Amino acid sequence: MFAIFHKRIIAHLNARNLIVGLGMGALMWAAYALQTVGLAHTTAGKNAFLTGTYCILVPFASYFLSGEKLTRYNLGAALLCLAGIGLVALDSVEFNIGDAITLGGAVFFAIQMAVTAKYGRKMDINVITFWMFVGNGILSLVSSLLFETQAPLSVWTPNFICVMAFLSVGCTCVALLIQNVGLAHVPASTGSLLLSMESPSGVLFSVLLMGEALTSRLLAGFVLIFLSIILSETHFDFLRRKPRPQL
């Protein structure tokens, strides 16, 4: 990313960009760390569902951080989306320590999205996204060295390196840069709903690529999430429009 945006990054090298970008990186690190630790103590489905609760939390985070107006459409869409994610991902209703940790991660995801939406409109989003990656990378490296067992050199095969490069560049750098650019141009509540499509998209690719069964429950979840996005974007105004009188 530095190779592409180095001129802008160097030109905008100041304390404000560093503080905002590194702060966003710290929020992202906390969110992913809690999500990962929580996953070790709960099921994958519950982890995905509870992480998806950020779609409800983002409107409140944006309200407190930037005064973004809360509307009944935002809240209704968030609840509808959460119900859809529940149908797609939730496999039980028991609550344990892993669920609580995962929910903490969702809080940090919501704050990070609200911060990105607030400052992305005022600052160069590419620059602060670069510093976000730097902050997240430093904290991830330190925590990995402190708490993780380091893999032997034998695992670094050409195939493993290609997979890691795809995950690091394509699924992380490119995806999060696009996400941040989008959040800088839409309300945070709308952005969080669109990002919640990650859950049904994961299931959809599991169906297409891995042969997972597509059940009526999954279809119902997809429909609810899709309806939540339509509600947020259109308020279903097209259903209330009066037909034009014919001459």
Give, region by region, the residue ranges found by the protein language model.
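C-terminal-most transmembrane helix of multi-pass membrane proteins
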Residues: 3, 160, 195-247
